[in-house]
Structures are given as structure tokens and as C-alpha cells.
Curated annotation (Swiss-Prot):
This is Bcl-2-related protein A1. A motif (BH2) lies at residues 132-147. InterPro entries: Bcl-2-like_sf, Bcl-2_BH1-3, Bcl-2_fam, Bcl2-like, Bcl2_BH1_motif_CS, Bcl2_BH2_motif_CS, Bcl2A1. Belongs to the Bcl-2 family. Retards apoptosis induced by IL-3 deprivation. May function in the response of hemopoietic cells to external signals and in maintaining endothelial survival during infection. Can inhibit apoptosis induced by serum starvation in the mammary epithelial cell line HC11. Seems to be restricted to the hematopoietic compartment. Expressed in peripheral blood, spleen, and bone marrow, at moderate levels in lung, small intestine and testis, at a minimal levels in other tissues. Also found in vascular smooth muscle cells and hematopoietic malignancies. GO terms for biological process: extrinsic apoptotic signaling pathway in absence of ligand; intrinsic apoptotic signaling pathway in response to DNA damage; mitochondrial fusion; negative regulation of apoptotic process; positive regulation of apoptotic process; release of cytochrome c from mitochondria.
């Protein structure tokens, strides 16, 4: 992927964490792609946090390095079968949101730019592991947005529900 593509993904990751942390976004706000992603990923994140509360309570994320290590372990398991789809990509963002909330609760000295550091390694993972697939499947606007816009209906709901179940079973391995 190009630097431009990395920048786009990095912006999506930052926008999502700003949404999770309720940080106001200057200017015209997030793009349409970012808004669609926020809606879908936030739904997944809330479901995972609700269903795995006791498990997540036992996970300690005290630094960005700890968050990066845990993120890489979970993503390695998530993608070990080589299958990539939009639902799995959404779970990356949902997990990013879970990590930032855990980190900001447990970090000794939270940094105002912590969300940017998390967004950076998330964007690197997406770029390095799913970038080609994203391109081949219409990109963010012609692939992701068309699939997950609210008008997509039941199929999107069922796919996301399936991804929630997958993420729940993956995270249970770490508790």
C-alpha cells in the first residue's frame, strides 16, 4: 500500500478512537467511511465488552507496548487461517477501542496522544495484513461503505453478529 493509503487507514483508526473517547473532531468531522465504520465497530465493541466483561476485567493493559503486544497476539489468532473479510476488519477497530479504554483506565501516566500511538500500530497491521484484500474488494468507499451502509440490512447484521461471536471466542483464550 502507498503512504497515502496508510494515511487514510491511520485517519480511520484515529477517528474511531476519537469516537470511543468522545474527543470532538475539528472541522467538518469524520468522513462518510469513518462514520459508517464508527457505527458498525462501536456496535461490535459494545457487544464484546458486555459479553466478555469478566474476562476483560482480568486483562491488564498498562502501557502502549502492552497494548501492542496483546493486539498482535489477538490479531495473529484472528487471521491465522488466512481469511480476510470486512467483518474481520471491523473487529480490528472494535478491539482497538477496547484496548484504548483499558489502557486509559490502567496506565500510570496517560498521555494525550496515546490514541495516536494505538492508531498507528493498528493502521500498520491493517496495511500490512489486509491492504491488498481491501484494494481487491473495492476499497473503503466502494467496498466497505457499500457493504455496511445502514441500507444494507439483514446481511450486514448477520455478518457482524458472526464476527462478534468469533471475537468473543478469540478473546476468551486470553482470560
Amino acid at each position: 500500500m502507498t503512504d497515502c493509503e496508510f494515511g487514510y487507514i491511520y485517519r480511520l483508526a484515529q477517528d474511531y478512537l476519537q469516537c470511543v473517547l468522545q474527543i470532538p473532531q475539528p472541522g467538518s468531522g469524520p468522513s462518510k467511511t469513518s462514520r459508517v465504520l464508527q457505527n458498525v465497530a462501536f456496535s461490535v465493541q459494545k457487544e464484546v465488552e458486555k459479553n466478555l466483561k469478566s474476562c476483560l476485567d482480568n486483562v491488564n493493559v498498562v502501557s502502549v507496548d502492552t497494548a501492542r503486544t496483546l493486539f498482535n497476539q489477538v490479531m495473529e489468532k484472528e487471521f491465522e487461517d488466512g481469511i480476510i473479510n470486512w467483518g474481520r476488519i471491523v473487529t480490528i477497530f472494535a478491539f482497538e477501542g477496547i484496548l484504548i479504554k483499558k489502557l486509559l483506565r490502567q496506565q500510570i501516566a496517560p498521555d494525550v496522544d496515546t490514541y495516536k500511538e494505538i492508531s498507528y500500530f493498528v493502521a500498520e497491521f491493517i496495511m500490512n495484513n489486509t491492504g491488498e484484500w481491501i484494494r481487491q474488494n473495492g476499497g473503503w468507499e466502494n467496498g466497505f461503505v457499500k457493504k455496511f451502509e445502514p441500507k444494507s440490512g439483514w446481511m450486514t447484521f448477520l455478518e457482524v453478529t458472526g464476527k462478534i461471536c468469533e471475537m468473543l471466542s478469540l478473546l476468551k483464550q486470553y482470560c
